Amino acid sequence: MPPNNVDIVREAYDAVNLGDLDMAVSCIAPDMEYVASGAVPGATGVFMGPEGVKEFIAGLYEEFDEPHADVSELLDAGDQVLVSATARGRGKLSGVEATWDTWQLWTVRDGKLVRGQGFTSREEALAAAGLDR
């Protein structure tokens, strides 16, 4: 049985947590778009395709030693998956451990991530998924 959308998103998070850029990129479509909310320090803007995703992930590893997202929820919303996570990492310059809550909404098509968007609140993410009603 092919993986479901939640499994695909989980695999992508596992890859990023491991720092495995090749594995992370294998989960995305060539024309994938990720819109960063700025919830992650230093990560704001739109990142396109495999190179954009690599740039985003590499930025995390430039800012933090061993960045990690502890996923607490993966909510299946049809072709979308809402992720709630607590991210953490030790600042490379400051040495200070940072943690922050984060939410992303992922769209999956044909077994690949085609769009992702970060949010600074669960309410915003639920509204974007049409689940706030």
Regions found by a protein language model. Name each.
Residues 1-133:
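C-terminal and inter-domain tail/linker signature
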